[in-house]
Structure formats: C-alpha cells, structure tokens
C-alpha cells in the first residue's frame, strides 16, 4: 500500500483485506470499506477531474454525495454508468473506473487550452459569436461546441440492467441515519410505530464514525454500533441503506432510489 494512508484510524475500513481496482487503466489497491475516492487518495492520486468549461484541474472537495469534482465513469461495456461520484463508490474486486471530460488523459488534457483563452470564452459567447452570423456558420461550429460540452458520455445501445419498483407503507419515515435519525427512529419504535429509516450511504451512523466525542457516555462510533444493532433487532424498524429519497409529493408520497448491486463484482441472481 502507499505511504499516503494513515497508519491508524478509519473505523469503516478493514486493513486486513486488500482490494485491487483500476482507475484510468492503472491498477491500484485499497481496503474493504474504502470508497473509490479514499482509495485513490491513499494511492497518491490528487487529480480527479477537469472543470466543465475551461478544463482546469480539480481535486476532491468533499467526502459524500455533495462532491462536485470527482465524477467518474464506472463499468465498461453496455453496463457503463457515467457521472458517478467517486466519494459514493464502494470499493470492490473488479472495480473499473475512468475519469471524464478530458482528452487524451486526465493528467494531460489538450482541452485545458481553453483556460488560456478564457477571456474570449465568456458565458454565452457562442450566441454572440456564431448565431448572429447566419445559420450556416452556426451549424458548422455547433458540432464542435456540443462535443466539447458535457461531462460523461452516455451510451446509445440498450440498457441491459433491470429496474424494479415496489411500494412501502410506514407510520414514520426517517430520511438520514445520522445521530438525529437514529435517535428519532428509536423514539418512534419505542412508541410502537412502524419505522422506515433511509440513508444514501452504505453505513448508518453519519458523522458518528468520523468525529470524536461521546454520546450517552460512549465514544460516538460505539454508540452508533449499539444504536444500529438495537434498531436492526426490532421487528417494527426497517433500515434501507444505499437509498436516496429524491422527492416529496402530494399525499405524503416520497420517492426513493436504492442502489442494489453497484457495490458488487457479481450481482446476485435477481439483482
């Protein structure tokens, strides 16, 4: 492993289990429990992407779903998924990821020349420069401008993945399984309510795994383990991890999307 990784700490990783993965064609190693972002950082990778327009170098900005820079393309072939946040990708055997929005490579991006001409490429420059000169001129340059725009590339062939939907009914829905969410779930469960706890991360507990201090006289991570175990043992509580609630609609209907198999090299038969 690289010397960039701390010798201790990291409660969610298993240092005894090493995992090989590939990024931009190069093989790296991480640990079980790593995200793609944390494993790349530990390997000495600090450049994760290029800015949308001027292709300026970009590194990690955050450690979760709010990450704006480290957008990668996962899985080769028809299962390809673009624009995935490296901070949300769980490391697993066989993981293949590629950077986006660069040519020919992340470290040497010819499109970075745009930065040299940024004064001439202000917002909406193409409307003033090309569209006012007549249709033939715009139609000529439109092809090149559209090819330079965007981040990841979507495939044009059929999507071979399967998507299922279901309905769940509950008395109390809690979005976010951090300390407040876990406490709220326990209180509702103690009152005899049917409780559904949803969190987009792979592990409940939120910042309790990262921050020091105590909760109810226990270190934060120990309290998190105990609270999660308590909720999992209750028949009236359901924990849904890797699930993002994306909308709140009329009549108390909420929409949620669960990542079922993205963290596995070989999904189960019906995933």
What are these regions (language model features)?
Residues 1-151, 159:
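Signature of N-terminal electron-transfer/Fe-S-associated modules in redox systems
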Residues 22, 160-169:
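Ferredoxin-like iron-sulfur electron-transfer modules
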Residues 46, 194-196, 238:
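Residue-level detector of anion-binding/catalytic polar loops
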Residues 112, 148-152, 166, 173, ...:
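Feature captures the FAD/FMN-dependent oxidoreductase FAD-binding
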Residues 166-196:
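N-terminal Rossmann-like FAD-binding beta1-loop-alpha1 element of flavoenzymes
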Residues 214:
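Glycine-rich phosphate-binding loops of nucleotide-dependent enzymes
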């Amino acid at each position: 492993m690289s010397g960039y990784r701390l010798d201790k700490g990291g409660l969610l990783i298993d240092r005894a289990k090493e995992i090989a993965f590939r990024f931009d064609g190069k093989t790296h190693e991480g640990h079980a429990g790593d995200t793609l972002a944390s494993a790349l950082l530990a390997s000495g990778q600090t450049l994760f992407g290029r800015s949308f327009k001027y292709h300026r170098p970009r590194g990690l900005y955050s450690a979760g779903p709010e990450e704006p820079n480290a957008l990668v393309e996962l899985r080769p072939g028809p299962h390809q998924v673009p624009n995935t946040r490296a901070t949300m990708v769980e490391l697993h055997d066989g993981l293949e990821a590629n950077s986006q929005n660069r040519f020919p490579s992340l470290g040497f991006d010819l499109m970075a020349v745009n930065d040299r001409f940024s004064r001439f490429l202000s917002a909406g420059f193409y409307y003033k420069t090309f569209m006012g000169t007549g249709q033939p001129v715009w139609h000529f340059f439109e092809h090149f401008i559209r090819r330079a725009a965007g981040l990841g590339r979507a495939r044009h062939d059929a999507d071979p993945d399967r998507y299922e939907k279901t309905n769940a009914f509950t008395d109390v829905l809690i979005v976010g399984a951090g300390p407040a969410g876990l406490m709220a779930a326990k209180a509702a469960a103690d009152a005899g309510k049917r409780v559904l706890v949803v969190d987009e991360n792979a592990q409940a507990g939120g910042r309790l795994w990262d921050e020091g201090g105590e909760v109810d006289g226990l270190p934060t991570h120990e309290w998190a383990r105990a609270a999660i175990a308590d909720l999992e043992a209750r028949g009236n509580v359901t924990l849904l991890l890797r699930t993002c609630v994306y909308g709140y609609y009329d009549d108390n209907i909420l929409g949620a999307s669960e990542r079922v198999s993205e963290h596995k090299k070989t999904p189960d038969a019906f995933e």
